Amino acid sequence: MFVLASASKARQKLLDQIALRHKVIVSDFDETQLQEPDPILKVKLLAKAKADSALKKLIEENHALNTYQALLGCDSLFEFKGEIFEKPIDKEQLISRWQRMSGQSGFLHTGHCLISLDNSKSDRESISQNNSCDGVVSTRIEFMNLSNFEINKYASTSEPYNCAGGFAIEGNGGLFIKKIDGCFSNVIGLSLPWLKNNLEKFGLSRLLLDR
C-alpha cells in the first residue's frame, strides 16, 4: 500500500490512473512557516516537510508501517517572470494574474519527496534520512491570448481557486493553454515518470498497475 501526503483530488486521480492503491494522510505542516523566495527550492522543501509530517502522523497514530511500502509528499507552484503564483486568494487576484499571463509563458514546478517504508522500523528520523529521495520537475506552459470576457468567465467558476497558478490543465483551464514543454502529469500535481523512476530505485515497481 502507498501513502499520499496530500488532499489533492487531482493527485489522487493520477494515482488511480496508474492503479496505484493508496491511502491519503494529509500533512499538518503549515506552509506559511516557510518563507523561501526561490520557487524551485521552495517546492522541494515543502514536499519534504509534507512527507515528514505525514510520516510522523502515520507513526503517532500507531499505523503498522509494515502494511505500507512508500509515502509521497508533493507541492506545486507556478513561476511567472520570477514571481511565485500559488493558489489565488480571490477573484480579483485571479483576474489580475490571468491578464498578465495571457499570451505569455511560465513554469509549473512540482516538488516530490518519496520515502520508502519497506522493512522500516518506527524511527521517523532514520526512515526519512536513509530511505528517501526528492526532486523537482518543471514544465514550461505557454498560454493563449485571452479576452477579458474569457478571463472573467473562467474566474466565475470554482475550478481555478484550488490550483497553483490559477488554472487546471485537466479541466476548463486546458482551453487556454497553447502548448507545454515537459511532463503533462506534473502540471496536474505530480510527475508520473518521476514517481515510476524513483519507485524502481527503491525496488517498489511492483506497486504500479496493481489492479
Curated annotation (Swiss-Prot):
CDD domains in alphabetical order: Maf
SUPFAM superfamilies: ITPase-like
Keyword list, A-Z: Cytoplasm, Hydrolase, Nucleotide metabolism
GO-annotated biological processes: nucleotide metabolic process
Broad class of the protein's primary localization: cytoplasm
Stated role: Nucleoside triphosphate pyrophosphatase. May have a dual role in cell division arrest and in preventing the incorporation of modified nucleotides into cellular nucleic acids.
UniProt-recorded name of the protein: Nucleoside triphosphate pyrophosphatase
